[in-house]
Regions:
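Histidine/acidic residue-rich metal-binding segments in metalloenzymes
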Residues: 1-6, 19-35
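Glycine- and acidic
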Residues: 6-9, 145-147
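The substrate-binding groove and active-site-proximal loops of carbohydrate-active enzymes
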Residues: 8-18
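C-terminal functional module detector
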Residues: 25, 29-35, 40-167
Length: 167
């Protein structure tokens, strides 16, 4: 439990996206520090492929990829979760990179004044087949695959919207 300091992140991608993100946002809105991570319960709970839910961590330049360094990147918020087909890189608010240490030296926290305008930048990419997959696209969000970029396709294009949630 996050409120008892028993876990550092909430796992995702194995239940409907609206449920998972609702739990995560409520946890954050209650003032708890909690990251989000991808998971695949293969082969324990269901037999979907390994890597169904993925978490990507940015390591500092020149830092060796080790489990410890990767976990510290997740803890510090230098990460994002996806389905392996959609990516958000170099996300910044007013030049403050996700997972950086803020004025109070806490990783991933940037102070901003109430009503302050923020310039948000990021590199985003989505990998979609040329033709829509209507089998996935038309399923209710309560059916697998819960997180899949196909659900976001704009019309018959290979484009998806980028949404910034402001709280």
């Amino acid at each position: 439990d996050v409120c008892h300091d028993a876990c550092d992140f909430i796992s995702s991608v194995d239940t409907p996206i609206t449920w998972e993100l609702s739990v995560w946002y409520h946890t954050l809105n209650c003032g708890y520090d909690c990251r989000i991570s991808g998971e695949t319960d293969f082969p324990c709970i269901y037999g979907d492929r390994v890597g169904l839910g993925r978490v990507y961590v940015k390591l500092p330049k020149g830092q060796e990829l080790t489990y410890e360094n990767w976990v510290h990147g997740l803890r510090d918020g230098r990460s994002y979760v996806g389905d392996g087909l959609s990516h958000v890189l170099d996300f910044k608010a007013n030049g403050f990179e996700v997972g950086s240490k803020g004025d109070d030296r806490r990783a991933g926290y940037m102070n901003a004044a109430n009503g302050e305008k923020l310039k948000i930048t990021a590199k985003v990419a989505a990998l979609l087949a040329k033709q829509p997959n209507n089998t996935i696209r038309n399923r209710p969000l309560s059916q697998k695959p819960y997180w899949h970029v196909e659900r976001s396709r704009i019309g018959n294009s290979q484009k998806v919207p980028v949404e910034l949630i402001v709280n």
